A protein has these predicted regions:
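Short, aromatic-enriched amphipathic alpha-helices that serve as compact interaction elements
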Residues: 1-15
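A beta-strand edge to alpha-helix "cap/lid" segment located at domain peripheries
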Residues: 52-127
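Aromatic side chains
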Residues: 7-8, 22, 29, 54, ...
Length: 127
């Protein structure tokens, strides 16, 4: 299971604050958030306290993160995924990247989310 699969499972779980266990004390982050397809977006930046406040402000009911692709090398992890309602309807697409510290926690975190584009899942080679 990738870093982001574990992180988002905690964030989307019954206690989203457990996701902070994946976050270094001195984290720096930016979240670029678009609600619609009009090109307007909002940026959230800060450290661990601001990330906690972002969790406080979010309505986590009825939707979750779904990682479509994940990878990494040299302490950098990324994930391409979707936020989806519980009925499977796509809300938006996200691309997340993090640099991990020596303990495997988020040190730098950047994510962009938009409903304006969707990616097709990769075909599965059953041979």
């Amino acid at each position: 299971m990738s870093f982001f699969e574990r992180y988002f499972a905690a964030l989307d779980g019954p206690d989203p604050y457990t996701s902070l266990e994946f976050v270094a004390e001195d984290v720096e982050f930016t979240i670029q958030w678009a609600r619609g397809t009009d090109g307007a977006s909002r940026q959230f930046v800060g450290g661990r306290g601001e990330l906690r406040a972002f969790i406080d402000a979010g309505d986590m009911t009825g939707w979750a993160h779904h990682v479509l692709f994940a990878g990494g090398a040299g302490g950098v992890e990324f994930a391409l995924g979707e936020t989806r309602r519980d009925d499977g309807e796509r809300i938006g697409t996200f691309l997340a990247v993090t640099q991990l510290d020596g303990e495997g926690r988020m040190l730098r975190y950047m994510v962009a989310r938009s409903p304006a584009i969707a990616f097709e899942p990769a075909p599965i080679d059953a041979t």
